Curated annotation (Swiss-Prot):
The species this protein was found in: Methanococcus maripaludis (strain C5 / ATCC BAA-1333)
Any one GO BP annotation for this protein: leading strand elongation
Alphabetical list of InterPro entries matching this protein: DNA_clamp_sf, Pr_cel_nuc_antig, Pr_cel_nuc_antig_C, Pr_cel_nuc_antig_CS, Pr_cel_nuc_antig_N
CDD domains given in the database record: PCNA
Name of the gene: pcn
Protein name: DNA polymerase sliding clamp
Alphabetical keyword list: DNA replication, DNA-binding
Amino acid sequence: MFRATCNTRDFKKVINATSNLVDEICFEVDENGIKASAMDPSHVALVSMEMPKDVFEEYEGDVHDIGIDLEALKKIIARGKGDEKLILDLDAEKNKLNVTFKSNVTRKFSIALYDVSSSNLKVPDIEYPNNVSIKAGAFVEALKDAELVNDHITLKVDEDKFIIYSKGDLNQSETVFDNGVDDDDDTLAEFNMGEASRSTFNLAYLKDLTKSTAAEDLLKIYLGSDMPVKIEYEVSGSKLVFLLAPRIES
């Protein structure tokens, strides 16, 4: 069996963040919570989510692989109000996931499930030379600046600085976060540099993986030259991890 009750607002954030990159995913359910990983259709990005049972108000789960149409689930979750309780209930016999919103009014939806099993897709264990922790709002603003210039962006770590850079045929954009400068609002909360590095990425993907963040969310970004960028952040106790392949420059 699988049955879980949680806050609608928090679950909505997790689903929105995941569905920005993938249309379907397999929820791997067990007594410890929900895990899921999937590649985007072009195999450029990987998304992984983990919702431990502690983030739910009530949780019961045996081992199940639940194939979810994320687009359908996202549309249903969007109908939920933040103060409503959200109840997820697996009907294994009918191969459906029941989604119930409960307040003084009860609303119930059912989603047909995909007949899929776990892909055993995991975030690879990569050793990165550099990592930074930065507020999502500042990172997103830098992406917006870069978008004015090009559809690709370079992330650089060099000389105690984290640099977000974009160059077009005529114009360029650069945002520099300096670890050596006092930062009263802790925009750059952590900076660990092992070596200078730079990698270039598709800007649209970076926008998608940060689209559901709040300005004060802390992104942990792992970087290395011509390596995939790994971005981690938490939403009310749930963990989201994104991996994006670099654009190899000739």
